[in-house]
Curated annotation (Swiss-Prot):
Active site as annotated: 210, 343
Domain of life: Eukaryota
Biological process annotations from GO: glycolytic process
Protein name: Alpha-enolase
Keyword Lyase: yes
HAMAP family with a match to the protein in the record: Enolase
Family per record: Belongs to the enolase family.
Gene: ENO1
Length: 434
């Protein structure tokens, strides 16, 4: 079915910043998609087009990206009479029209908004759920419910505390279903709130951008200790493991790392990549840490390679790989990490996201689907993670509606699948081998 109309507009993300929303109409109805945006962005990401007009939204408006959709992309796609089930064809058309390496002409936010809306319309055209359509596009005969990685303690660029490392996550791998994983996650979250309140006072339970707590602690080990205590109090020490997103590029300074980067600069406290690696090894030894994302700077390839070779845990590339097939290919060759963080807005189209995922999976990597810190109520990534069978998703704490929107959609998908529902559980790194 061809596209009747496409209309983009500025809406607001969860941080009160403008973002792009796209309405796409076919004979089957209206299909709407909204684009997220990140706070700690990798320098190699596709370009998110902002207006940079300081008199409006402090320069963060997206009226240019919206205009590119309404004035250029929409008329072109409508005149070409393309069928919405032809995801790759439509994405390629937009990429050719943009003509730049990093989507800087239209903006990844313009292209992605249309691409997501097309995918939703394609599912309706086929009369199947979105996750099934995505599975078909990726060539997956079955679908898998993911283990949720709940970001329950926030630091780094997401929080006003002194904590350098950005996310401390809990993964309920011992659950039997996604629904049970949600219950375990919520119960640990509420126990954690009480633990933090008792130790640091009530204002320490204010939440960060992704719904996690941001107590004013400096030591990263203290965050792990809080998690360990909360998991124990909830009674799930045998079912919950820990993941971290260090976002080390945020505190990389001249070949070294500053674990107190939110205080006045003092080069004497910087540590070497080897010292930082030793710190991680201590975390893995003393806590149930099974996954570390962005342990080093996005260009510190040697440190990545050395660390990944020395551990058996999941090492996730985000700023390193930015969902970009060229960066992923280099990381595969260098054995820099063993898991891809998949963010649709880093690469900027559904087709390229699928390609990035398949490239990682075909090389034996894990894949974790991810939200961004600036989110909307759009639930596309919930269907994406099920269709791509990656087995793991991070989309914040079980708090804040823009986070719960995704988790609640996953609950609905599991319910809809009924007896056919499969939950990744302890096989979250490679869920297809059961």
């Amino acid at each position: 079915m061809s596209i009747l109309k496409i209309h983009a507009r500025e809406i607001f993300d969860s941080r009160g910043n403008p973002t792009v929303e796209v309405d796409l109409y076919t004979n089957k109805g209206l299909f709407r998609a909204a684009v997220p945006s990140g706070a700690s962005t990798g320098i190699y990401e596709a370009l998110e087009l902002r207006d940079n007009d300081k008199t409006r939204y402090l320069g963060k408006g997206v009226s240019k990206a919206v205009e590119h959709v309404n004035k250029t992309i929409a008329p072109a796609l409508i005149s070409k009479n393309v069928n919405v089930v032809e995801q790759e064809k439509i994405d390629k058309l937009m990429l050719e029209m943009d003509g730049t390496e990093n989507k800087s002409k239209f903006g990844a936010n313009a292209i992605l908004g249309v691409s997501l809306a097309v995918c939703k319309a394609g599912a309706a055209e086929k009369g199947v759920p979105l996750y099934r359509h995505i599975a078909d596009l990726a060539g997956n005969p079955e679908v898998i419910l993911p283990v949720p990685a709940f970001n329950v303690i926030n630091g780094g660029s997401h929080a006003g505390n002194k904590l350098a490392m950005q996310e401390f996550m809990i993964l309920p791998v011992g659950a039997d279903t996604f629904k049970e994983a949600m219950r375990i996650g919520a119960e640990v979250y509420h126990n954690l709130k009480n633990v933090i309140k008792e130790k640091y006072g009530k204002d320490a339970t204010n939440v960060g951008d992704e719904g996690g707590f941001a107590p004013n602690i400096l030591e990263n080990k203290e965050a792990l200790e809080l998690l360990k205590t909360a998991i124990g109090k909830a009674g799930y020490s045998d079912k919950v493991v820990i993941g971290m997103d260090v976002a080390a590029s945020e505190f990389y300074r001249d070949g070294k790392y500053d674990l107190d980067f939110k205080s006045p600069d003092d080069p004497s406290r910087y540590i070497s990549p080897d010292q930082l690696a030793d710190l991680y090894l201590g975390f893995v030894k003393n806590y149930p840490v099974v996954s570390i994302e962005d342990p080093f700077d996005q260009d510190d390839w040697a440190a990545w390679k050395k660390f990944t070779a020395s551990v058996g845990i999941q090492v996730v590339g985000d700023d390193l790989t930015v969902t970009n097939p060229k960066r992923i290919a280099k990381a595969v060759e260098e054995k820099s990490c063993n898991c891809l963080l998949l963010k649709v807005n880093q690469i900027g189209s559904v087709t390229e996201s699928l390609q990035a995922c398949k490239l990682a999976q075909s090389n034996g990597w894990g894949v974790m689907v991810s939200h961004r810190s600036g989110e909307t109520e759009d639930t596309f990534i919930a269907d994406l993670v099920v269709g791509l069978c990656t087995g793991q998703i991070k989309t914040g704490a079980p708090c804040r509606s823009e986070r719960l929107a995704k988790y609640n959609q996953l609950l609905r998908i599991e319910e809809e699948l009924g007896s056919k529902a499969r939950f990744a559980g302890r096989n979250f790194r490679n869920p297809r081998i059961n």
